[in-house]
Regions:
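Short, solvent-exposed loop/turn elements at beta->coil junctions and helix N-caps
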Residues: 7-9, 102-107
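A short coil-to-beta-strand element that immediately follows conserved catalytic motifs
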Residues: 2, 94-101
Length: 170
């Protein structure tokens, strides 16, 4: 299969491309959700010995869900820089230690989005968190012990992956 044409068909808060894919003698028309690159982090507060997640309303499930801190990479920003910014915006912490868990396509059948997932250790809260007012973010912070986090019925894929990584570490 080979992409022979690409055209932006929607350019709003998110972007959608229309691709023409050559498959032998057949040309297929496919839509591609193109939100950009994102970062996420499982955050551990070493001073309080608690994992800190977020809860906010999400359009996909049309509900509030618990998930790890996450956000979009701005322009040519490095993933490490973006995740530090997002942790401060959403949770109010400065990052002490950062470890990459995985770079992944969360939904490669329909989306070009790539998410880099990190583990972050924090100990200094220098902001309020809760998200940015200008982005209309209303983010609640949730604290978990390791045991309660491992038992939490999570539904967000990047969060499930980060918590499974934690479980495998022992």
């Amino acid at each position: 299969m080979q992409i022979i044409d690409r055209r932006r068909v929607f350019d709003g808060h998110y972007k959608v491309n229309q691709l023409i894919v050559q498959d032998g003698d057949v040309q297929l028309k496919r839509e591609q959700f193109a939100p950009g690159k994102a970062v996420a982090a499982l955050v551990y507060d070493t001073a309080r010995q608690l994992y800190v997640l977020t809860r906010q309303f999400r359009i996909g499930p049309e509900a509030e869900i618990a998930e790890i801190a996450a956000g979009m990479i701005d322009g040519d920003e490095a993933p490490e820089t973006a995740v530090r910014r997002e942790i401060h915006e959403e949770l109010g912490y400065e990052v002490d230690k950062l470890e990459k868990i995985v770079e992944m396509w969360p939904s490669p059948g329909t989306s070009s989005e790539i998410i880099t997932v990190f583990y972050a250790e924090v100990s200094r809260k220098t902001g309020d968190g809760g998200g940015l007012a200008e982005e209309n973010e209303k983010i609640e912070m949730l604290d978990f012990t390791k045991e309660t986090l491992l038992a939490e019925p999570l539904q967000d894929a990047k969060t499930v992956i980060a918590v499974q990584w934690l479980r495998l570490r022992g």
